């Protein structure tokens, strides 16, 4: 087993740093896992580390996009087996569905999503590292094949942290950059079932931008906001999602409408602002709290000596933190760093 785990970890590391896009990332991670945990399909989601909603998605031979709303129902509104939040905080970050145990009889995911689409077993993994959940991964087997075993669940548990770090490496594989767009922000109003009631012109462009590489029709685009709307209704407040795009970062915000019908929400989509994006970037790029303090002052335009006085540290310490920030963000100078963060 040790050799198999080491081989899988090596493949996972290569995928995180070498994947050109989200689709390739998912494909290469699936291939790295296939020796230890054979599967027929997968669904990978990266999560905004602050709001915990899906910010990118990749899958092959997996659940249909429309059925993902039923999957979210099992996470937020009904008590289904192995919700990712429970796996995140539980003793194991791996859960298996489809083993035939009594507790699965009323599973919405098993009966309404998996069975109608020909899947008999699911092994889901909460991709946790450093106390945060960076993504989720569901591995699928077709009906008629053996269920995922306890031994395979143990193998998957060994790969939780490497998989989480691979997602971080993928997002942080190059310096951040502002998304330049002359298009106005999109504003979309949805009802309690997440059907679009009204939208500004050009909204489809922004929805599609949140799914780079997506080739489906416009009627499937609401999958880009479903996780945010479920979370906003659960929290009864606004939910911000920061979406990595090949040309920069996109910011989405879902929030309940005052005085509206039950469940109605407004969703705005636009290029991410520095204020919104910076906390997520510090997480993705592994910035320490002290480095983050220096970074926030630098973004405000303060020179090194003034940053030192404000933070009550030496100028030498400030310079050390700035050098660490240059390395983590993949830039060579302060001007380049600030340009990368000028959203």
Predicted regions and their residues:
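Regulatory input/activation interfaces that engage signals or partners
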Residues: 2-151, 155, 161-165, 169, ...
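PAS-family sensory domains
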Residues: 160, 183-243
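Recognition helix of helix-turn-helix DNA-binding domains
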Residues: 288, 301-336
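Short alpha-helical interdomain "coupling" segment at the junction between an upstream regulatory sensor module
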Residues: 167-182
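Short helix-to-turn junction characteristic of helix-turn-helix DNA-binding domains
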Residues: 298-302, 341
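PAS-family sensory/regulatory modules and their coupling/dimerization elements
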Residues: 225-274
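Short amphipathic alpha-helical boundary/capping segments
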Residues: 279-287
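The N-cap/first-turn positions of alpha helices
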Residues: 290-294
